[in-house]
């Protein structure tokens, strides 16, 4: 009798994806983040579902319902903070996952890569709408500022913003629809994740050397299942340390004040994981230009397969490209820092220089360095 694992139509799919999957023998811990993102998504959906059981999406009661969850619901505070800090862990894993893809040239699997970029957009949209739901000061003003950016679109901008708001300002209609979208998007993300994996398993995983590894494959289970479990334990350890010791470390104190349309907070800023894009947005004095730069700062990832000029796939054997890559990482840290600072000298000029450098590295410096490294190969 053949094993049910290999014959059953449904179990067979799981078997080919997680058990008998041929994987390169040399993939490092940087390849753990895919599974960690899967765990993050599961944590977010489960905690989010339990929060939705007690949350009310009405402007009058939203803030109170979150307070009620934290004070009166059994372990409500735990669920709420796991969900809030789970989002931070999600983005940490996302950024490391994308960074791994850039460093090791994984973007040459362009279907997998482009779906990954769409996933990044979807997760960012979900996180933004989730931040609006507690209806604190930063929720309200964040929603107002970010949705208002769409008014920069010529001709249809103002109509579009009022259509999204469901009125002439961010109000009850906006909150209700954001809750609806915030609830449905994670399931759309789950479907996209399956497509992401489908395309990945068409080609097989990349590896640190960037070379074809067909001649040296090992089964995913038990080797990488054990390795992934270690990553999951570390992820849960860090998440629970955040949740139980400093749950508000990454939040904004302004969000503990109920939303008030008559009182603007002194510094409107999004959650930390959007600060780099927010800094790029603010560094351009023109509204439409800023919005375009904001969208392009993420959309530019789709250009990496086209901009890849090197004869080698990975950066493992390209020290000059490695230097430029780490300068890009430092630049993103700088942008994140600037995004959280007030709009005044010297932060404005630092933000503008960091934004220019970000686009320069991706569009000019990295391809140029790659071409230069190709000439060095001929020596």
Curated annotation (Swiss-Prot):
Protein's job: Component of the ubiquinol-cytochrome c reductase complex (complex III or cytochrome b-c1 complex) that is part of the mitochondrial respiratory chain. The b-c1 complex mediates electron transfer from ubiquinol to cytochrome c. Contributes to the generation of a proton gradient across the mitochondrial membrane that is then used for ATP synthesis.
Family matches, as InterPro entries:
Cyt_b/b6_C, Cyt_b/b6_C_sf, Cyt_b/b6_N, Cytb/b6-like_sf, Cytochrome_b, Cytochrome_b_C_euk/bac, Cytochrome_b_N_euk/bac, Di-haem_cyt_TM
Name the positions where heme b b566 binds: 97, 196
UniProt KW Electron transport keyword: yes
Give the organism the record lists: Tamias senex
Q: Which PANTHER family match?
A: CYTOCHROME B
Any one GO MF term held by the record is: ubiquinol-cytochrome-c reductase activity
Alphabetical list of Pfam families matching this protein:
Cytochrom_B_C, Cytochrome_B
| Location within or outside the cell | Mitochondrion inner membrane
Topology relative to the lipid bilayer, per the entry, is: Multi-pass membrane protein
Q: Which Gene3D superfamilies match?
A: Cytochrome Bc1 Complex, Chain C (1.20.810.10)
Q: Which cofactor does it need?
A: heme b
Going by the UniProt record, its keywords in alphabetical order are: Electron transport, Heme, Iron, Membrane, Metal-binding, Mitochondrion, Mitochondrion inner membrane, Respiratory chain, Transmembrane, Transmembrane helix, Transport, Ubiquinone
**Domain of life, source organism:** Eukaryota
Q: Give binding positions for a ubiquinone.
A: 201
Got a GO cellular component term for this one?
Answer: respiratory chain complex III
Cofactor, how bound (note): Binds 2 heme b groups non-covalently.
Instruction: Report residues binding heme b b562.
Output: 83, 182
Q: What else is known?
A: Heme 1 (or BL or b562) is low-potential and absorbs at about 562 nm, and heme 2 (or BH or b566) is high-potential and absorbs at about 566 nm.
A GO BP term, please?
mitochondrial electron transport, ubiquinol to cytochrome c
Q: How does it assemble?
A: The cytochrome bc1 complex contains 11 subunits: 3 respiratory subunits (MT-CYB, CYC1 and UQCRFS1), 2 core proteins (UQCRC1 and UQCRC2) and 6 low-molecular weight proteins (UQCRH/QCR6, UQCRB/QCR7, UQCRQ/QCR8, UQCR10/QCR9, UQCR11/QCR10 and a cleavage product of UQCRFS1). This cytochrome bc1 complex then forms a dimer.
Protein's gene: MT-CYB
Descriptive protein name: Cytochrome b
The residue ranges crossing the membrane are 33-53, 77-98, 113-133, 178-198, 226-246, 288-308, 320-340, 347-367
CDD domains recorded for this chain?
Answer: cytochrome_b_C (cd00290), Cytochrome_b_N (cd00284)
PROSITE patterns given for it? CYTB_CTER (PS51003), CYTB_NTER (PS51002)
* Protein family (similarity comment): Belongs to the cytochrome b family.
């Amino acid at each position: 009798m053949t094993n049910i694992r290999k014959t059953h139509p449904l179990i067979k799919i799981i078997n080919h994806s997680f058990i008998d999957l041929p994987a390169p023998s040399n993939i490092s811990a940087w390849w753990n983040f895919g599974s960690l993102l899967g765990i993050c998504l599961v944590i977010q959906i489960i905690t989010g579902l339990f929060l939705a059981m007690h949350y009310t999406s009405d402007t009058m009661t939203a803030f109170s319902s979150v307070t009620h969850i934290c004070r009166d619901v059994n372990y409500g505070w735990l669920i709420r903070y796991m969900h809030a800090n789970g989002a931070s862990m999600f983005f940490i894993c996302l950024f490391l996952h994308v960074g791994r893809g850039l460093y090791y040239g994984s973007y040459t699997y362009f279907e997998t890569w482009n779906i990954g970029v769409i996933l990044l957009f979807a997760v960012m949209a979900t996180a933004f709408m989730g931040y609006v739901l507690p209806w604190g000061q930063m929720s309200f003003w964040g929603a107002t500022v970010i949705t208002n950016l769409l008014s920069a679109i010529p001709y249809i901008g103002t109509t579009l913003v009022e259509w999204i708001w469901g009125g002439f300002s961010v109000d009850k209609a906006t909150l209700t629809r954001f809750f609806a979208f915030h609830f449905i998007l994670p399931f759309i993300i789950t479907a996209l994740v399956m497509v992401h994996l489908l395309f990945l398993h068409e080609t097989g995983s990349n590896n640190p050397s960037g070379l074809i590894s067909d001649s040296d494959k090992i089964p995913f289970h038990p080797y990488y299942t054990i390795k992934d479990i270690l990553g999951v334990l570390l992820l849960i350890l860090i998440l629970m340390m955040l949740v139980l010791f400093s749950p508000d470390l990454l939040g904004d104190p302004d969000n503990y004040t109920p939303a008030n349309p008559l009182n603007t907070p002194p510094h409107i800023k999004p959650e930390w994981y959007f600060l780099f894009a927010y800094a790029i947005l603010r560094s351009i004095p023109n509204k439409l230009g800023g919005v375009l730069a904001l969208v392009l700062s993420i959309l530019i990832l789709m250009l990496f397969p086209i901009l890849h000029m090197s004869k080698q796939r990975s950066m493992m054997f390209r020290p000059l490209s490695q230097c430029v890559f780490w300068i890009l990482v430092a630049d993103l840290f700088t942008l994140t820092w600037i995004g959280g600072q007030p709009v005044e000298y010297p932060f404005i000029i630092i933000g503008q220089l960091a934004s220019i450098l970000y686009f320069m590295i991706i569009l000019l410096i990295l391809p140029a360095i790659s071409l230069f490294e190709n000439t060095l190969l001929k020596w």
